[in-house]
Structure formats: structure tokens, C-alpha cells
Amino acid sequence: MGQKINPIGFRLGINRTWDSRWFADNAEYGQLLHEDLKIRAYLMEELKAAGIAKVVIERPHKKCRVTIHSARPGLIIGKKGADIEKLRKKLSEMTNSETHLNIVEVRKPEVDATLVAQSIAQQLERRVAFRRAMKRAVQSAMRLGAEGIKITCAGRLGGAEIARTEWYREGRVPLHTLRADIDYGTAEAETAFGICGVKVWIFKGEILEHDPMASERRATESDNQGGGGRERRRENA
């Protein structure tokens, strides 16, 4: 079962927490859920160059707080914060509520599964050999502290007539171990031969305490230690 299920959903409430953190009654729930989906789709498309790792949405008391985890926050903020203000206004229109926007820098994109998957997909679109892209990602992740990584690419790899799946793994990736801190990300590469899917699993160690926020807190501490300074964060109200 651990081999097939989404590793993040499998660990929700154990050492991972939700990316949408709000409660609503039955009348509003469907509308707010669709708003979340639209916000994420819009940000992923609009800020594709910024390397979006995760979008966290909170809704405290008729407001909306959106936290964007990005590898290149400068592209979102813009010169003197002009771009982030435009983005905040657009999100306010989409939600019909006051929106607060936070930008958090991901200091180690090489060990973030979503960013690794996006990087490999972009290389496939540029016709980089898939084996070279996968090996380079594996080596970078292991060098920067990952305890294990697994990458799969599926589709008409290299323009082959028949689609197939290729994968690489290095280190340990214990998918059945619930205390394991496993990050998971996917991406799609739109090549001339069709769409190729990329999946990435990264094992970052074990979390022994039973705390849904443990994984997020641990990632922040790791970023601060590895980045040589305090966490870079921009908040715009």
C-alpha cells in the first residue's frame, strides 16, 4: 500500500499537515475548495519561472492568507514590491475577500521534491537526455543532505515509439514507514513526442514526535542552518 499511495496524504496528521488550513460549513465548503484550486492553478501558471514549491492557504475570519514557498522569491516580489502588490490585488478579486500574501524562500531547492520534478521536466522539454537529467538531480539531492531519493520518468522518452518508465534510486526511501519524512512531487514535460510524467520521492530522515507540523518546522530549521542566515520572508498585507 505504501508503494502506491501518495506519501504526503498517507502521513497527514502524523508528521505532515494540510496545505489548505481552514474550516467551513457545508454551504460554503464547495465554493472555498474551488477557490483554492483556482488560486493554486493561477499561481503555478503565472509564477512558473519563480519555482513554486508549495502554496499554503489559510482563511482566518473572512480573510484569506496565501503563503507561497518559492526558490526565486525576487521574481514574485519585483522591483520595490510592485509585482507582489499586483498579485495580491488579483488574488483579492478571485476570493472576494481581503488577501494577505507571504513569500517564503526555499533555500535548498535540490532537496524539494516538487522543484526537482519541475527541473527535470523543464530539461526534458529542452531535449536534455532524460538519464543525464535524472542522475544530475539524484547526485545534487544526496550531496545536499537527502538520505534517499527515487525518480521515475514515464512516456515516450527520447522520442521512442513505445512509451516506457525509467527510474533511478539512491539511498533509502522507506515508503511504508510512517515516521519517515518523505517529500513527494510530480511534474509534466510537454515534449514534441507527447507528455512525459516525472515523479520524485525524497527521504529526509525520520521524525519521531507525533506532530502534524513537525515536517514543516524541520524544513524551516534546515533552511536556516544551510542558508547561512535567517529565513528570507516577505509579507504583504
Swiss-Prot record:
InterPro entries attached to this UniProt entry: KH_dom, KH_dom-like_a/b, KH_dom_type_2, KH_sf_prok-type, Ribosomal_S3_C_sf, Ribosomal_uS3_bac-typ, Ribosomal_uS3_C, Ribosomal_uS3_CS
A molecular function (GO) term: mRNA binding
Region (Disordered): 213-237
PROSITE patterns in the cross-refs: KH_TYPE_2, RIBOSOMAL_S3
Pfam families (alphabetical): KH_2 (PF07650), Ribosomal_S3_C (PF00189)
UniProt domain KH type-2: residue ranges: 39-107
Organism of derivation: Sinorhizobium medicae (strain WSM419)
GO biological process: translation
Signal peptide: none
Subunit architecture: Part of the 30S ribosomal subunit. Forms a tight complex with proteins S10 and S14.
Stated name of the protein: Small ribosomal subunit protein uS3
Task of the protein: Binds the lower part of the 30S subunit head. Binds mRNA in the 70S ribosome, positioning it for translation.
Keyword terms, alphabetized: Ribonucleoprotein, Ribosomal protein, RNA-binding, rRNA-binding
UniProt record similarity statement: Belongs to the universal ribosomal protein uS3 family.
Cross-referenced CDD domains: KH-II_30S_S3 (cd02412)
Disulfide bonds: none
Listed GO CC annotations: cytosolic small ribosomal subunit
